[in-house]
Swiss-Prot record:
The gene is mraY. Its main location: membrane. GO terms for biological process: cell division; cell wall organization; peptidoglycan biosynthetic process; regulation of cell shape. Its EC number is 2.7.8.13. CDD domains: GT_MraY (cd06852). Catalyzes the initial step of the lipid cycle reactions in the biosynthesis of the cell wall peptidoglycan: transfers peptidoglycan precursor phospho-MurNAc-pentapeptide from UDP-MurNAc-pentapeptide onto the lipid carrier undecaprenyl phosphate, yielding undecaprenyl-pyrophosphoryl-MurNAc-pentapeptide, known as lipid I. It is a multi-pass membrane protein. This is Phospho-N-acetylmuramoyl-pentapeptide-transferase.
Amino acid sequence: MLLLLAEYLQQFHKGFAVFQYLTLRGILGVLTALSLALWLGPWMIRTLQIRQIGQAVRNDGPQSHLSKSGTPTMGGALILSAIAISTLLWADLTNRYVWVVLIVTLAFGAIGWVDDYRKVIEKNSRGLPSRWKYFWQSVFGLAAAIFLYKTAPTSVETTLIIPMLKDLAIPLGAGFIVLTYFVIVGSSNAVNLTDGLDGLAIMPTVMVGGALGIFCYLSGNVKFAEYLLIPYVPGAGELIVFCGALIGAGLGFLWFNTYPAQVFMGDVGALALGAALGTIAVIVRQEVVLFIMGGVFVMETLSVVIQVASFKLTGKRVFRMAPIHHHFELKGWPEPRVIVRFWIITVILVLIGLATLKLR
């Protein structure tokens, strides 16, 4: 929005041309979203408290979690508001990738909002039934996949790239739709499973989102893409503004979500942020790198799959409780220790993901 205004004002003063720079608008995206989250956060927390929109805590979980009962939830609406406003202000609104990521993020946020609403407001412990949740996730995930497939100008944008094997490119054809669906929906649910401790999900999301922003910037620049042997995706660089907004909104939310949390993001935030990461990774053809950098999300998801499969097949549980962060809590790890160690793991994995840029 402001980019269009700056382009108009260039005829009066050339200084407004500075807003053409992606890096500047990415930084402004961070600062705008961060400011909005910090400004609106206290008001949202008070509103949630007044409306008694509080988190219910499982009785079979760690006893330390009982004190969290009643903590305001659905704070993900704060994150999504800050991301949306910042992106609409600073991004090029003629760029199709910006709209795809933004719409997918808000659509999955809407699914999470309905789920949270039924749990908290309607006092329905099941929330949105799983079959309906996955149905709507599938609808929006497939819609995004089909749109990206149908509008791809070159086969590069539907080719699977393997890090460290950059000479190997696997044309997916219509299989791109299937892969994209699983990446978006899988990433959405993986972040949601991770969101069980104060700040546990949001900081890895911020770090992975920041790294994906770097991939977006490099993939959108033909010279960098050719030098690094990564897919050149025209227009992908504009997503650095969205990634910047995600970083700012995430850090602003973490200000209130850090241990002991004043607010939880709820499904409205977790499902949306996971879907955003998955969609961005698909656009820049870095699904495998997302799998690496989001290793904490993958680990949390696998722990649930293993736990359920083991119990159904043998009647025994592999972990004391799943997702795996609860397993470590029940082993006696204090909550802050689990959180920070998972953050450290994410830092290492993100660095490995970024290192694939130079590995041939």
